[in-house]
UniProtKB/Swiss-Prot annotation:
Described purpose of this protein according to its UniProt entry: Aspartokinase-like protein; part of the gene cluster that mediates the biosynthesis of loline alkaloids, potent insecticidal agents composed of a pyrrolizidine ring system and an uncommon ether bridge linking carbons 2 and 7. Lolines are structurally differentiated by the various modifications of the L-amino group and include norloline, loline, N-methylloline, N-acetylloline, N-acetylnorloline, and N-formylloline.
Source organism (scientific name): Epichloe uncinata
Sequence ranges of Basic and acidic residues compositional bias: 1-11
Region listing for Disordered, in residue ranges: 1-27
Organism phylogeny: Eukaryota, Fungi, Dikarya, Ascomycota, Pezizomycotina
CDD domains reported in the protein's UniProt record: ACT_AK-like_2
Name of the protein in its database record: Aspartate kinase-like protein lolA1
Molecular functions per Gene Ontology: aspartate kinase activity
Leader sequence segment: none
Length: 209
């Protein structure tokens, strides 16, 4: 389910004849923005979900710490601070986490900005006991957009091509082995645009072509 409905007033769909690959894309004019849809996806997804108030944490181990010990210390810190992990990835010994603000202790302000700022301070305090400052990167004010659909090898490529065509940068990607769900971490400022793009390109355009 979508957690917000983009404006639909004055929508129009037209083939881009000036594009030599016009058979592979269309431009959807919606109010003051143009949405580019690549060719219809293999299967229309079932739902799109957005989760806001996310902080991305990138951790780089010190050279003297073995990978297995670094992993253990990271998860011990997460358990101690009772932080919910929404996404997790590793690359060359580095760890990237997407943490939800819902794991914070009670009494946090209702302000979205205040929640993220408080989480950043609390998290930094916990991580500083684990790593030097220059080994920790925090990216607050992020969101996770998840696309749930039927299994298809082409679904991931179609989604990322759609995001790239509409200049929606991703910070983190998760794709389950069953190919039923794809999740991307994006900046909160892109959530409304991403929902609008996905509704137009993954639902409407796929269903009508």
């Amino acid at each position: 389910m979508l957690d917000e409905s983009p404006m639909r007033k004055g929508d129009s769909v037209s083939n881009d004849q000036s594009n030599p690959e016009s058979n592979a894309s269309v431009s959807i004019h919606q109010q003051n923005q143009i949405i580019t849809c690549v060719s219809p996806g293999p299967v229309c997804p079932n739902a799109i979900e957005i989760k806001r108030d996310i902080v991305i944490v990138r951790l780089r181990p010190v050279e003297s710490c073995p990978g297995y010990r670094f992993f253990r210390r990271v998860f011990e810190t997460l358990e101690k601070w009772q932080l919910q992990v929404d996404m997790f990835s590793t690359s060359l010994g580095r760890i990237t986490l997407a943490l939800g603000a819902a794991a914070l202790q009670a009494g946090i302000s209702d302000s979205c900005s205040a929640r993220n700022d408080m989480m950043s301070r609390d998290l930094m305090h916990g991580m500083q006991k684990l790593l030097p400052d220059d080994h920790i990167e925090l990216f607050p004010h992020m969101a996770i957009i998840s696309v749930v659909g039927h299994p298809s090898r082409r679904m991931a490529g179609h989604i990322f091509a759609t995001m790239d065509a509409n200049d929606i940068p991703t910070v983190m990607i998760s794709h389950d082995a069953a190919r039923l769900g794809i999740a991307c971490a994006i900046s909160e400022q892109y959530t409304a645009k991403a929902l609008c793009v996905f509704e137009q390109c993954l639902f409407r355009y796929s269903l009508t072509h």
